[in-house]
């Protein structure tokens, strides 16, 4: 049984329960922005340090698979320790030119109690040619930079 004391952050799930795809070798990425100190590749491995946009505002991250994939699990981890804001993201999958929503969600970051958002999606997707992640870092229109701690796919 997993347990935690009230008021503490939710622990990051163990990294070994899935056979995560090696996205570095089976996909290419398209990005709307990237901070050189926090490259996109850093979000594609557990504990990699994460990606951050170089510019404020809405950002799009796209994974284009070299060959169509069967996907069963998608993990997104967002972390914000500095700024209170409400973030929204849209995760979509595409196959044969048709795109479909997986999730559209909002999350309120509020330090020190709510700084980590972990999303686990159990899916049964076949023939996936791309995954798109659109992040609106602050739905109120502030000058926040989007970031993504982890994007793991099995």
Predicted regions and their residues:
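Aromatic, loop-rich ligand-recognition surfaces of beta-strand-rich domains
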Residues: 43-100, 120-154
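Low-complexity, compositionally biased segments
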Residues: 22-25, 38, 99, 104, ...
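Disordered, acidic Ser/Thr/Pro-rich linker "stalks" and the adjacent N-terminal cap
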Residues: 1-66, 81-83, 152
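Extracellular carbohydrate recognition and processing domains
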Residues: 100-123
């Amino acid at each position: 049984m997993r347990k935690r004391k009230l008021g503490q952050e939710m622990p990051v799930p163990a990294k070994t329960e899935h056979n995560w795809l090696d996205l570095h070798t089976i996909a290419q990425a398209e990005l709307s922005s990237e901070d050189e100190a926090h490259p996109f590749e850093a979000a594609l491995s557990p504990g990699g340090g994460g990606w951050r946009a170089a510019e404020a505002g809405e950002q799009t991250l796209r994974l284009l698979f070299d060959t169509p994939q069967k996907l069963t699990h998608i993990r997104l981890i967002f972390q914000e320790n500095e700024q209170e804001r409400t973030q929204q993201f849209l995760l979509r999958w595409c196959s044969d030119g048709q795109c479909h929503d997986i999730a559209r969600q909002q999350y309120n970051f509020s330090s020190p109690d709510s700084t980590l958002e972990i999303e686990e999606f159990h899916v049964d997707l076949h023939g996936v040619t791309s995954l798109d992640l659109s992040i609106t870092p602050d739905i109120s229109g502030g000058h926040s930079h989007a970031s993504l701690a982890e994007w793991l796919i099995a």
